């Protein structure tokens, strides 16, 4: 079992209001989760599914170090280092000093760009919805020179959660929804 994924899912599940275990078949879940990554990554990625009880099931073993999953309705595919970043975020710990890549080629439903722990849109939390994108985690991402604006154009690269320990690069690869 991969504890970081469990923690991440357990934080997101109540927000999503979705009982994933009963929602879709494993075959459909695998197809949907893999849609987060480019075909070359998806073909060898692991797929995990977290049940209503928080237990993680590996639906498909991988060979390339990427793990794909669905959190709420957001599909993502993470390398090992991005999972370490997510683990740190969920545990309110300092993020690792490693570069990590996460694909979200299906886009997202939105997040606060000022508060990593916000659970929904408010008048002052700079909610942003980004279309298909990838994320780059770790200190080197801060050297890319992307805007750190709280309300950036989601069609251009920007730094999410700028000024927090969890700052990372958001790199759109398609139009925002």
Give a label for each model feature.
Residues 11-19:
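Hydrophobic h-region of N-terminal signal peptides that target proteins for export
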